[in-house]
Amino acid sequence: HIDAETMTLHHDKHHATYVANANAALEKHPEIGEDLEALLSDVDALPADIRQALINNGGGHLNHALFWELLSPEKTEISAELAADIDETFGSFDAFKEAFTTAATTRFGSGWAFLVVNPKGKLEVISTANQDTPITQGLKPILAL
């Protein structure tokens, strides 16, 4: 359970600030476009003067956007395909939950736990510091906390 005050703080303050700061960085180099996923998939190609701002704030925006997208007031079931992939990778859904919980609760300081798809199409649980997004590592996040 996450309380309403924490959710409001993350939505109205943190996420809004990441969006504003990412947009401010992008305004300095309109020639690179605005597709944050594409830009963050090759951070070395970013202009040096905005690279860290986009890593921090673009990552913060993408991480929060995925988190909000996945929230639902109703309990939902995962797809049969994802359930099978989880069983294949982790052995069981309970083992996945344990791995994900460990990733979320053992991060020192601020950060995220993710279920990602790696370039080989396999699932992994990872943890990133601060607002680092798995996209910079060539991973596709499908669950974020």
From Swiss-Prot:
GO terms for cellular component: cytoplasm. It holds the Pfam family Sod_Fe_N. It comes from the Bacteria. Its EC number is 1.15.1.1. Keywords: Iron, Manganese, Metal-binding, Oxidoreductase. Mn(2+) binds at H10, H64. Binds 1 Mn(2+) or Fe(3+) ion per subunit. Fe(3+) binds at H10, H64. GO terms for molecular function: metal ion binding; superoxide dismutase activity. It catalyses: 2 superoxide + 2 H(+) = H2O2 + O2. Its cofactor is Mn(2+); Fe(3+). Belongs to the iron/manganese superoxide dismutase family. Destroys superoxide anion radicals which are normally produced within the cells and which are toxic to biological systems. Catalyzes the dismutation of superoxide anion radicals into O2 and H2O2 by successive reduction and oxidation of the transition metal ion at the active site. This is Superoxide dismutase [Mn/Fe]. It comes from Streptococcus acidominimus. The lineage of its organism: Bacteria, Bacillati, Bacillota, Bacilli, Lactobacillales. The gene is sodA.
